[in-house]
Amino acid sequence: MLYEALLGLGPDGGPRHSTALLAEVEWAAAMAGDWEAVGALAVGLGPGSFTGIRIGLSTARGLAASTGLPLRGACTLDALGRALAERTASEGGPCSLAVLDARRGELFAGLYTRAGERLWDPVVLRPEALGERLGGLGEAPLAAGSGAVRFRHELAGRGVLVPDDADPVHRVAARHICALADAEASGDGDGLAPIYLRPPDAARWRERDTSKRAE
């Protein structure tokens, strides 16, 4: 059985505190039949909140070390793309656009086929740049995720289809993280790398301070 140790996000999409996350992990393990019933750990690698990704990956590595279970990871956008593929396949719909709110007025995005295969590697860009990139598509994609909800108006202006805000397709599901991670051949948790797509705020602030001192 593959157990998802982390998505790194709370119900509101924000990072969870590590102590709360550990309590949820223990609860999930108990629901599975305790740790003896768990065959591997899966972790969402991002993109997403810097804090959430760091907490999640470090927590998952700690659990892997303490339990001896293999640790695997999956891209959060790929998991959302997989959920969208299930929707478009059942409805005979278009390609899928996974969109997460990256804050700072930007989006994390990935485009997927009806089968959930990548057409783009994950990118970070502003809504207007995403709209321009979608301009070459022959059909309007179906979009989901926190970014699709937040920038619904901008995406709709480009013909992108966005389900209602309450539609569960907007949530990254643990089962999709698990399925993607389970397909990974490697179980070396030390080799997993977070997917940030841009420098953290602290790095930008240091660069800004350095530039000011150099002036």
PLM feature spans:
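N-terminal beta-alpha supersecondary unit
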Residues: 1-47
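A general structural signal for well-ordered alpha-helical segments in protein cores
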Residues: 18-25, 60, 77, 174-178
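Short, hydrophobic alpha-helical segments
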Residues: 29, 138, 178-186
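DPxDG-like acidic metal-binding loop motif
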Residues: 42-73
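Short, flexible loop segments at boundaries between secondary-structure elements
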Residues: 165-183
